[in-house]
Amino acid sequence: MADVLGKQFEEKFKKDFSKLPNADIFRLHDQMSGYKVVSKNPSDYICYCYPYHFYIECKTVKGNTFSVNALTQYDKLLERANVKGQRAGVVIWFYEHDKIVYVPITTFEKLKLDGKKSVNIKMLDEKLYNMVEVPSKKLKVFFDSDYSVLLNLNEGW
C-alpha cells in the first residue's frame, strides 16, 4: 500500500508545485535493470520557480521516522546542493501524522555527521536541524500543499 501511496503522492507533489507562478517541473523516470528498478537519477523531479532550481526527491513514510540510509539518491543530491540558486532536498509525507516536510540534503549530511540514523517527525519541533513543514490542507487522503514555502528559505537550505 505504501508504494501505491508513494506514487500517488509524487503525482500530487507535481500538481501542487505546478500551481506556483511560472513554475516548471519535470519528472525523471526510474530506469529498469532486469526486474529491478534502479534509479541513476539525482531525484524524482527537477523543478524551477524563479529564482530557484530544485532537485526534489519525494518519499512517503508510515511511522515517525525516515531512515537516512533509505535515501539512495543521497550522493547525487549532495553534489547539487552547493550551487547558488540551486536547492536539493527531500519532501517527506509522514502520512500517519498528516504532515509534509521538506528536508534539505544538507540536513541529511548533518544528520549523518551527528551519527543520527533517521529523520524523525519530532525533529520538526525541536528545530535542531533545518527542515520545514509544508503548509497543507487535508483532503480525503492527500493534501493541497503550498510549496511556495520553499522559495522563502535561506541559501544553503
Residue ranges and their predicted role:
Residues M1-K36:
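Acidic-basic catalytic patches of nuclease active cores, encompassing PD-(D/E)XK
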Residues L28, Y55-C58, V91-I92:
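Short, conserved beta-strand edge motifs with alternating hydrophobic and charged residues
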Residues V37, K62-Y74:
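Active-site-adjacent loop/helix micro-motif of nuclease/hydrolase catalytic cores
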Residues N41:
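Beta-rich catalytic cores
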Residues Y45-G63:
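Conserved catalytic cores of phosphodiester-cleaving nucleases, focusing on short active-site segments
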Residues A81-K110:
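Nucleic-acid nuclease catalytic cores
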Residues V103-M123:
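A contiguous, mid-protein "functional segment" used to position or interact
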Residues L124-W157:
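Charged phosphate-binding loop/patch that engages nucleotide di/tri-phosphates or the phosphate backbone
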